[in-house]
Amino acid sequence: MQGKLKKLWLRIVLFIAGFAGVFIFLYPFVTKGIKNIGNLTGVVLGICLILYAAWFHRVNRRVKKWMTRTAGKVICGIVLLIVLVAVGFAAAGTICMIRASKSAPKDETVMIVLGCGVNGDRPSLMLTERLDAAYDYLNTHEEVVCILSGGQGKGENISEAECMYRYLTEKGIAQDRLYKEDRSTSTRENLLYSKKIIEEKNLDPQVIIVTNEFHEYRASVIAEHTGIKPSAVCGNTAWWLLPTYYLRELYGIVFEWIF
């Protein structure tokens, strides 16, 4: 009886976790139209938990039956290995994200704000988070100049660099402290083209990178490859966006490690 009760509670927990996962990862898509490999992965994992909870006993019986056969043991072993490798990469990536986001600025005099999306001619929520973090730092460190990096994408009336420039100048940051880099279409290009501005203007290659906390690690790795020495100022990601972009970033980190 006690064993049945434990299994019942486990199924309930799996159902709740599955439905919560589907909701959390679908919410950005439903409300903001955000769709990427992060929320796709989250929704698929949530559905898998729901299906497992629904067919709990049937799945367990089938696995036990497979485990009596050599082929079944091999398949289960491969699946377990894949899961362990995925969990290992996720854990390592998470640790790297956290450590990079804690890399506080020292006496750097150059800042790079990485663009991430414009709605018409206004910054997206995530870009606003980055810009607010940049503004707070620039407002209290008047010796710091700032490179605003981001080209013009689909659905954007102006470049991300121009949008950031307008946002910061409207809030009172002096125009002569801001440089626009408006050709980039990826994090790698953000930093490569910003490096050219640093060299052209004879600026210090030790820079502060402003992006969201989950993105700081990969941005810092790419920066180091281009010869930039980075520290971090992070925009605080809205809680309902973080799971989606966290999972997407894990894919980006693994890709960066492998390739």
Model-derived regions: residue spans:
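Intrinsic structural disorder
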Residues: M1-K7, G18-V22, I112, A134
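Internal/C-terminal transmembrane anchor helices
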Residues: T68-G93
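Membrane-embedded alpha-helical segments of integral membrane proteins
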Residues: W9-R61
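A structural signal for short, hydrophobic/glycine-enriched beta-strand patches
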Residues: A91-R248
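Structural signature of transmembrane alpha-helix termini at the membrane-water interface
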Residues: F23-V30, A54-R58, G88-I98, V254-I258
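Membrane-interface helix-boundary motifs at transmembrane edges
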Residues: Q2-L5, G33-I34, V59-V74
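Hydrophobic alpha-helical transmembrane segments of polytopic
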Residues: V13, A17, L45, I78-V85, ...
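Short hydrophobic helices that act as membrane-entry/anchoring signals
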Residues: G3, L10, L14, Y245-F259
